[in-house]
Amino acid sequence: MHKIWMRLAAALAVLFALSATPAMAQATRTWVSGVGDDVNPCSRTAPCKTFAGAISKTAAGGEINCLDPAGFGTVTITKAISIYCNGPSNGGILAAGTTGVVVNAGATDTIVLSGLDVDGVNTGLNGVNFLAGGSLVIIDCQFRNFSQNGIKFTPSGNAGLHVE
């Protein structure tokens, strides 16, 4: 009888071990490239294609870097994150008929946007629409051809804005 219980316990342990799903850790630094693919892990050697693809694989407080000067699509930011596309790798966002970057993050989250070229193609609404977060830092970014605002800063609580 004791052997039956031991075998049953061992079988249950194996069953639970096999059914457990592994935790997917997010990277603190990810990359995007015009020749990337959003199914990639967004590493330097296997970059993502869009900011939206990279942001889901980047840990809160992490950063996304551009490997080349391509268009990386619009993005909604819901956590502390930095997007750096300075130098010859300026990242582009084409936001025809929509907003380029929507920020709706936590009350203490800092968001940094650096080196972005955001184009509304005359029908885009806003380059950046900041709804919530702790602070927004914009460095060396261009916002052009929007029907409403380049930067719309209407936080739901206390927040800071720094533009260089």
Language-model regions, residue ranges each:
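N-terminal secretory signal peptides that target proteins for export/translocation
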Residues: 1-5
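Bacterial N-terminal signal peptides
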Residues: 9-20
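Sec/Tat signal peptide C-region and signal peptidase I cleavage site
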Residues: 21-25
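Cleaved targeting-peptide boundary
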Residues: 26-30
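Acidic Gly/Asp/Thr-rich repetitive segments characteristic of extracellular carbohydrate-active
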Residues: 34-73
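Right-handed parallel beta-helix/beta-spiral solenoid domain characteristic of secreted/periplasmic
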Residues: 74, 80-129, 139-142
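Small-residue (G/S/T/A) turn/hinge positions that recur once per unit in extracellular repeat modules
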Residues: 107-109, 134, 157-159
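Solenoidal tandem-repeat scaffolds enriched in leucines and small polar residues
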Residues: 149-164
